[in-house]
Regions:
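N-terminal periplasmic/intermembrane-space "pro-region" immediately following the signal or transit peptide
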Residues: 2-11, 16-56
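Loop-centered beta-sheet repeat module
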Residues: 185, 189-242
Length: 393
């Protein structure tokens, strides 16, 4: 009994600690011994239960304004803090649960009756080459950066930052070969109350589902793909199409890159970025909006423990068809710049420390300026801290 109390106490203490990197496929399945195992000398670890604390802890200095030179201040923060446990019950049943500990809740409730702070609450069933997953899960969207553990990303591009990623439904994954996989997924497209997402003056869709087909490919560990096409019934008679093409390149064991191409065409503005410019139309979000993103990330390990990385994203947002209130055309051209250095003190490259610069330029065309926005604005961020997916057990 005393040992059980001590183990529970150690887990709670670990939850108050703080941290992993912008390198794909570091999902936590490593051989590092868990904190509870180390403290209590547990010799064997079972695949039926793995417990992690995903954290990104940092100190930030912020500048903003039209020139990006107005100092806004500094602060310490947990940018990401998630508890996660998962396991393999037997050869054909698995489970996974992950919840964000530093995310607020909606007072209006949730369409799928599950807290938005819960990323994943799923059960998987495998039969030969096919795996079926039921519950709240990550959308099977393409893109390399989208597939990363959120703690590994210093700043998302707007396309992903304004996207709903975790929804309830079913997914089937077919391993055609060990290096080629197809996924088919149906999710509740509405996570929050529909009125909160799109405005009150809408007619809800009777089947507001998100349908996605996804291809994950690997070619000799040199070139990998994560491509997808999605269709969603947003509200009655308004639909969304989303395409994402992720391409990862491993040039050498030390040098790699990925290129993500993303396009979203929304009958009613799901992301809300255009609505933030032009305002609501007849009590609902703007209509006929579109978003396009190109993202390039590169990294180079100058030493087994030292990594240099850089990322640039170019994004365009606009309206593809005029309405009586809003004219067709481009409203914004945005740039994102991220670069820095990481230090990995451990061989498994789980824990790492970082010093990172994040710069964002928001450009507004004449169409957006007609709504009172400046031609452009900048934000600059200098951040230092550490990232770690702490293996508690």
């Amino acid at each position: 009994m005393k040992k059980q109390i001590l183990m529970a106490g150690a887990a709670m203490l670990a939850l108050s600690a703080g941290a992993q990197t912008a390198i794909p496929n570091s999902g936590g399945d490593n051989d590092e011994q868990g904190l509870i195992q180390t403290v209590f000398g547990i010799k064997e670890k079972t695949d039926k239960f793995h417990l992690y604390l995903n954290t990104q802890t940092n100190f930030n200095l912020n500048w903003s304004g039209e020139g990006g030179t107005d100092f806004d201040g500094g602060r310490f923060a947990f940018k990401q803090l998630r508890i996660e446990f998962k396991g393999q019950v037997n050869d054909w049943i698995s489970y996974r649960y992950r919840q964000r500990l530093n995310k607020g809740q909606s007072e209006l409730g949730y369409f799928d009756n599950i807290l938005k702070s819960i990323d994943i609450a799923e059960v998987g069933f495998r039969y030969k080459k096919v795996n079926f997953v039921v519950g709240k899960q990550c959308a099977a969207y393409g893109g390399i950066e989208f597939d990363l553990n959120p703690i590994e990303v210093y700043q998302y591009c707007d396309m992903i930052d304004y996207m709903d990623n975790f929804m309830t439904g079913v997914r089937a994954a077919w391993d055609i070969t060990p290096s080629q996989q197809l996924q088919f997924q149906i999710l509740d497209g509405i996570a929050l109350n529909p009125g909160e997402m799109y405005g009150e003056n809408i007619t809800k869709a009777k089947l507001p589902f998100l349908y996605t087909v996804n291809w994950n490919g690997n070619f000799n560990n040199i070139y990998s793909t994560r491509w997808s096409a999605s269709f969603m019934n947003e509200v009655k008679n308004k639909h969304m199409w989303y395409f994402a093409f992720g391409n990862q390149f491993n040039f050498t064991p030390r040098c790699g890159a990925w290129l993500d191409v993303m396009y979203s065409r929304e009958g009613i503005d799901r992301k809300g970025m255009i609505t933030n410019v032009v305002g609501e139309q007849d009590g609902h979000n703007a209509l006929n909006t579109e978003y396009f993103t190109l993202l390039l990330h590169m990294n180079y390990f100058v030493h087994p423990k030292w990594n240099l990385f850089g990322k640039v994203a170019w994004e365009r947002n606009g309206v593809y068809k005029s309405t009586p209130d809003v004219v067709k055309g481009t409203y914004g051209i945005d740039w994102l710049y991220v670069g820095g250095v990481e230090y990995y003190p451990l061989k498994d490259r789980g824990l790492h420390f970082f010093l990172t610069y994040v710069g964002q330029r928001q450009g507004h065309t004449a169409k957006a300026q007609a709504y009172g926005l400046p031609s452009h604005s900048y934000t600059n961020l200098l951040t230092a801290g550490f990232i770690w997916q702490i293996p508690l057990f």
